[in-house]
């Protein structure tokens, strides 16, 4: 597993890239990251659907873990997304972080964008 720590405008962001290629958003807060605050039995068991950056639904694809009460908790192909790249740039208004993920069977790419404005902790 690889961990990416980012601090911007007093916000702490932690991404974990797991051995299976999935990227997880573990922390996004003004508080420091403490792994013990978030670990639970569900995450320890299979990680499926936990802390995903994005969920993607394509009609006709089956969902694993079907239901959790009255709601779906995992989307397809969202649960299969693998980490491809993280770009970290700065422009005249602040910092821009883009996380690219892909799903090999369908060929789709998902880009999640995190925009930070200079001097503003939001």
What would you call each of these model-derived segments?
Residues 38-52, 56, 61-63, 95-97, ...:
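A charge-rich, low-complexity, intrinsically flexible signal that marks solvent-exposed coils, linkers
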Residues 20-34:
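Short, surface-exposed, low-complexity cationic segments
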Residues 60-121:
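Extended, loop-rich substrate-binding clefts of extracytoplasmic carbohydrate-active enzymes
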């Amino acid at each position: 597993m690889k961990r990416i720590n980012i601090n911007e405008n007093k916000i702490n962001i932690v991404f974990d890239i797991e051995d299976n290629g999935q990227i997880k958003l573990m922390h996004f807060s003004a508080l420091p990251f403490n792994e013990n605050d978030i670990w639970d039995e569900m995450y320890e068991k299979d990680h499926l659907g936990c802390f995903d950056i994005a969920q993607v639904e394509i009609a006709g694809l089956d969902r694993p873990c079907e239901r959790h009460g009255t709601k779906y908790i995992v989307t397809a192909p969202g649960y299969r997304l693998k980490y491809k790249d993280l770009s970290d740039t700065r422009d005249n208004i602040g910092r821009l972080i883009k996380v690219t993920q892909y799903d090999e069977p369908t060929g789709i790419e998902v880009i999640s964008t995190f925009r930070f404005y200079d001097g503003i902790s939001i």
